[in-house]
């Protein structure tokens, strides 16, 4: 294409954009008007929501069930056993539903993914509702099957509240740092994502459990608190995980190597598991999309 013809094409393209914008009385790019309701609420959103309900239910059922039994009889389940159970259920759920919903199971994780543009904001309330629903249902099922155990794996501070807050921030930072690496970076080993995140949860909860309970998850705390009618230091387990996930995601985003890999490297590094998990995250439209249109 000659220089003159390219210039004319670009001018025509700009005129078309201007005409559309004038007709709609807005400077908003037409891309946003062309988006259908299905783009915002995809047909598979219900399946993703159900996936989050089920996975969060099982997460809370296993972790809080183990903690509840440990609290009533330390000879049946050890502190280490609780941590291993929590790490294993996270690993299993990531492999089971990671390709469907991303296996967030945690409102703070969903928030961090949305803030750093790995998840659409419009779907955040649906994920939060699913996660809290799964947690609350699991907690009341535990209340029924573990009766007369009254405290069902609630997370409460064992010392000053600020000690537990700092612990929750640090352990959740660790979990989110690892999660963002294995879930979004094509250079990370995707097939080991479940093991990496599950191990991070297990390792940090071994020592955090003795101080704060090692929640790392507002949903995991709220359900048992409601079922046990115990709300001591509840704010810690909302503020701490949110600060931890946001700081962990920001840190990995900052140090992430941004140079675009070659097609050959991409095919070698991007595992089938990671590809399916990334495809489950409907990434929001890039604000600079028009800059990449070829004319």
UniProtKB/Swiss-Prot annotation:
Membrane topology: Multi-pass membrane protein
Localization per record: Membrane
Function: Aquaporins facilitate the transport of water and small neutral solutes across cell membranes.
GO molecular function: channel activity
Residue ranges annotated as motif NPA 1: 106-108
Domain comment quoted from the record: Aquaporins contain two tandem repeats each containing three membrane-spanning domains and a pore-forming loop with the signature motif Asn-Pro-Ala (NPA).
Transmembrane region(s): 49-69, 83-103, 124-146, 164-184, 192-212, 230-250
A Gene Ontology biological process term: urea transport
Organism encoding this protein: Zea mays
Coiled coil listed as a keyword: no
PANTHER family assigned to the protein according to its UniProt record, in alphabetical order: AQUAPORIN NIP2-1
Cited InterPro entries: Aquaporin-like (IPR023271), Aquaporin_transptr (IPR034294), MIP (IPR000425), MIP_CS (IPR022357)
Family per similarity comment: Belongs to the MIP/aquaporin (TC 1.A.8) family. NIP (TC 1.A.8.12) subfamily.
Alphabetical keyword list: Membrane, Repeat, Transmembrane, Transmembrane helix, Transport
GO cellular component terms, semicolon-separated: membrane
Motif NPA 2, residue numbers: 217-219
Name assigned to this protein: Aquaporin NIP2-1
């Amino acid at each position: 294409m000659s220089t003159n013809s390219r210039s004319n094409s670009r001018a025509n393209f700009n005129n078309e954009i201007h005409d559309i914008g004038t007709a709609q009385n807005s400077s908003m790019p037409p891309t946003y008007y062309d988006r259908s309701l299905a783009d915002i609420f995809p047909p598979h959103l219900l399946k993703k929501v159900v996936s989050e309900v089920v996975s969060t239910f099982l997460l809370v059922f296993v972790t809080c069930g183990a903690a509840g039994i440990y609290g009533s009889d330390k000879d049946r389940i050890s502190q280490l056993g609780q941590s291993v159970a929590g790490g294993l259920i996270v690993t299993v759920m990531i492999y089971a539903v990671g390709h469907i919903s991303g296996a967030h199971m945690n409102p703070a994780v969903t928030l961090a993914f949305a803030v750093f543009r790995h998840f659409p904001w419009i779907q955040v309330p649906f994920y939060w509702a699913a996660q809290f629903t799964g947690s609350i249902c699991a907690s009341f099922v535990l209340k029924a099957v573990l009766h007369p155990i009254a405290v069902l794996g609630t997370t409460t501070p064992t010392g000053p509240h600020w000690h537990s807050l700092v612990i929750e921030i640090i352990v959740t930072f660790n979990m989110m740092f690892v999660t963002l690496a294995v879930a979004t970076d094509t250079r990370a080993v995707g097939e080991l994502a479940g093991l990496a995140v599950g191990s991070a949860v297990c390792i940090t909860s071994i020592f955090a459990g003795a101080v704060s309970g090692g929640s790392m998850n507002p949903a995991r705390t709220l359900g048992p608190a409601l079922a046990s009618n115990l709300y001591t230091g509840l704010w810690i387990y909302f503020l701490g995980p949110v600060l931890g996930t946001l700081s962990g995601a920001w840190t990995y985003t900052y140090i992430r190597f941004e140079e675009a890999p070659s097609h050959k490297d991409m095919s070698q590094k991007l595992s089938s598991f990671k590809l399916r998990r990334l495809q489950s995250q409907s990434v929001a439209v890039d604000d600079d999309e028009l800059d990449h249109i070829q004319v």
